[in-house]
Curated annotation (Swiss-Prot):
One of its GO terms (biological process) is photosynthesis. The lineage of its organism: Eukaryota, Viridiplantae, Streptophyta, Zygnematophyceae, Zygnematophycidae. Signal peptide: none annotated. It is found in: Plastid, Chloroplast thylakoid membrane. This is Protein PsbN.
Length: 43
């Protein structure tokens, strides 16, 4: 394979992995530990 193809595949896998981790953090099990600043602020 050419170097450019491998670089594109590597960057694509990195992007998909980062997106999956971000979705897991936002909506998965760790989301219960996230704080909500709007809930904490009393008007």
């Amino acid at each position: 394979m050419e170097t450019a193809t491998l670089v594109v595949i590597f960057i694509s896998c990195l992007l998909v992995s980062f997106t999956g981790y971000a979705l897991y953090t936002a909506f998965g099990q760790p989301s219960k530990e996230l704080r909500d600043p709007f809930e904490e602020h009393e008007d």
